Amino acid sequence: VLSGEDKNNIKTAWGKIGGHAAEYGAEALERMFVVYPTTKTYFPHFDVSHGSGQVKAHGKKVADALTTAVGHLDDLPGALSALSDLHAHKLRVDPVNFKLLSHCLLVTLANHIPADFTPAVHASLDKFLASVSTVLTSKYR
């Protein structure tokens, strides 16, 4: 459960990301593909090389979904219901991959906003991404 402080930290950090969300989303995906190469199996039709237009486009989708989630911290299940259905029923993404991408996103954010990536912000963003992952995998059961 996200506390009031967590919600404030998440909104503030996401505000610092600003117009770079799509870029950071793509960078996190690229990082995931390099560090966890088995994740590429979910993107057989993608060019997963550095700078790929397909990775950039999917990074924007990830960033847009997270921006939606940041705007609906009190109702993540409602805000992400369609995305949860998509990943559970059509894409059938292994739930562990959400954790891997979350980790890569945290590393990416720490790299780009180091002054604002305090231990408290790190903890809040980690809880947020874990909550998003839980919602996205909730319909697997």
From Swiss-Prot:
Protein name (Swiss-Prot/TrEMBL): Hemoglobin subunit alpha
Domain Globin stretches: 1-141
Homology family: Belongs to the globin family.
Any GO BP: hydrogen peroxide catabolic process
Binding site for O2: 58
Residues modified as Phosphothreonine: 108, 134, 137
PTM sites of type Phosphoserine: 3, 49, 102, 124, 131, 138
Quaternary organization: Heterotetramer of two alpha chains and two beta chains.
Record-level GO cellular component terms: blood microparticle; haptoglobin-hemoglobin complex; hemoglobin complex
Organism of origin: Ondatra zibethicus (Muskrat)
Summary of the function given for this chain in its UniProt record: Involved in oxygen transport from the lung to the various peripheral tissues.
Binding site for heme b: 87
Entry keyword annotation includes DNA-binding: no
Tissues/organs with expression: Red blood cells.
Modified residues (N6-succinyllysine): 7, 11, 16, 40
Residue positions where N6-acetyllysine is found in the record: 16
Modified residues (Phosphotyrosine): 24
Annotated GO MF terms: haptoglobin binding; heme binding; iron ion binding; organic acid binding; oxygen binding; oxygen carrier activity; peroxidase activity
